[in-house]
Design a protein with these regions (language model features):
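N-terminal leader/targeting and accessory segments in enzymes
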Residues: 1-93, 97, 275, 387
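Nucleotide phosphate-binding/pyrophosphate-handling subdomain across enzymes
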Residues: 2-5, 15-25, 132, 267-373
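Phosphate-binding loop of NTP-binding sites
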Residues: 4, 23-24, 59-63, 72-215, ...
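C-terminal helical cap/extension that packs against the catalytic core
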Residues: 42-43, 362-417
């Protein structure tokens, strides 16, 4: 019998993992990437005898596929995808494909902001509790690679809307929806489509599964009833009492998973390692998931108080001459920058800008007027930023490199200030990606 052909589009972390798993499961595998493939992935393909091409898409080969597994970074309207859809070849994502070959528990986490922090925190709790847990999706390793080579009992997955769009049969045993604010509107026809994409994390869930969500998020609250959700709901809120779920009472996080008054778990917000209102939400979500999994209270409490956040996410990098330098390069949308500013109660010099994804800066205006003493614009086209904040910030300066941004910001700063790289934009105009932007920022700070 002829082997089924699988074509994998995109040869990054997820593509390489999908290729290795498909090969292990007996498929005829071909990997195609329109860009250059990193050496580490070429080595993986060679070692596993997987055919690949780079810097091109050979349509003749691609259209012979029985199934295509595409990278989440490839939009559905890309020319290569249009031809695949025309030929009615089934298309999946790496997470969807990997989930067919494991019966392990899946904890899926999505939202416009806070996904990475909540995913890392949840994984930290599970690991410290002694559970064999993998970290995958948008952070950590490829799920498919782990399923193929290093299977775990639990997988904690950070899921972007693009990954959720490529899922049909995937089911989260625990689904977490943190918030929904306008983002990626360059990839979605409307905000409603993006909302539907986020809610699709509940697809295929049954009454035996859990859906943890933020009750205070207006978009989630308004759209809940329009989605047929079968899972047991566990809302969390800092504004009202939610049972079963999590809420705030006198600066104490109270988690109650039963329909009665006795709390399952309590902890003071002053003991959280992650401060700021958005991080109370992130901590609540992770703690509810851990409680559902019956992890011991002491372990959850320890993890919420000793967790260190990811690189590039409100990362306090250095203090030089009494000025704090904070790398929040992962803030690629306006809401992420709003959360960052909301965390500080000292004067901020804000490094802002990059590739604008249709940003509405008016959301930031009140916080910028209140907290920001100068803006350093790091991008090729900063007209929108100047227009948005010219009335409330005296000093707005344009720069074209991380070195220049840090030098300019430190020249404007005085002791006690915070220099915050929180760009609210994608990074592709001046940098490879947000990691490259964050690392260049830290190198420039080090050079001070």
């Amino acid at each position: 019998m002829e082997k089924k052909k699988i074509v994998i589009l995109g040869a990054g972390e997820s593509g390489a993992g999908a290729a290795v798993l498909a090969k292990a499961k007996g498929y005829d595998v071909f990997v195609s990437d329109s860009g250059a493939i990193k050496d580490k992935y070429k080595t993986i393909f060679s070692e596993n005898k997987i055919a690949y091409e780079e810097k091109q898409h050979t349509m003749e080969k691609i259209l012979q596929a029985d199934e295509v597994i595409k990278s989440p970074g490839i939009p559905s309207k890309a020319p290569v995808m249009k031809k695949i859809y025309e030929k009615k070849i089934p298309v999946s994502g790496e997470i969807e494909f990997a989930s067919r070959y494991t019966k392990s528990k899946m904890i899926g986490i999505t939202g416009t902001n806070g996904k990475t922090t909540t995913t890392l925190l949840t994984h930290h709790i599970l690991t410290k509790a002694g559970l064999k847990a993998g970290l995958a999706g948008n952070v950590g390793h490829s799920l498919a690679m782990m399923v193929a080579q290093d299977p775990r009992d639990y997988y904690v997955l950070e899921l972007s809307s693009f990954q959720l769009d490529d899922m049909k049969t995937f089911k989260a045993d625990i689904a977490i929806l943190l918030n929904i604010t306008p983002d990626h509107l360059d990839r979605y026809p409307s905000f409603e489509n993006y909302i539907d994409s986020k809610f699709s994390i509940t697809r295929n869930q049954t009454s035996a599964d859990a859906f943890i969500y933020c009750e205070d998020d207006l978009v989630i609250a308004e759209n809940l009833s329009q989605h047929n959700i079968s899972a047991q709901p566990y809302p969390f809120s800092i504004k009202k009492k939610t049972i079963p779920g999590a809420y705030l009472d006198n600066n104490e996080i109270i988690i109650n998973l039963k329909n009665h008054q006795n709390p399952t778990f309590t902890m003071s917000i002053h003991n959280l390692s992650l401060q700021g209102r958005h991080n109370i939400y992130n901590s609540m979500a992770a703690a509810v998931a851990a409680n559902i999994l019956n992890i011991r209270k002491e372990v959850i409490r320890d993890c919420l108080s000793d967790f260190r956040n990811a690189e590039h996410r409100l990362e306090h990098f250095a203090t030089v001459h009494g000025v704090d330098y904070v790398n929040d390069s992962k803030a690629t949308n306006v809401n992420s920058t709003w959360y960052a500013l909301e965390s500080y109660h000292r004067p901020v010099i804000l490094i802002l800008g990059g590739v604008d994804k249709g940003n509405d800066y008016s959301i930031l205006k009140d916080l910028v007027c209140e907290k920001v003493k100068a803006i350093v614009c790091l991008g090729k086209d900063n007209k929108k930023i100047h227009k948005a904040f010219k009335d409330c910030v005296k000093m707005i300066v344009d720069v074209s490199s991380a070195d220049e941004a840090v030098a300019t910001a430190s020249g404007l700063a005085t002791k006690g200030d915070v220099i915050l790289l929180s760009p609210a934009c994608a990074s592709f105009d001046l940098f490879e990606n947000y990691e490259d932007r964050g690392r260049q920022f830290k190198r420039a700070v080090k050079a001070l």
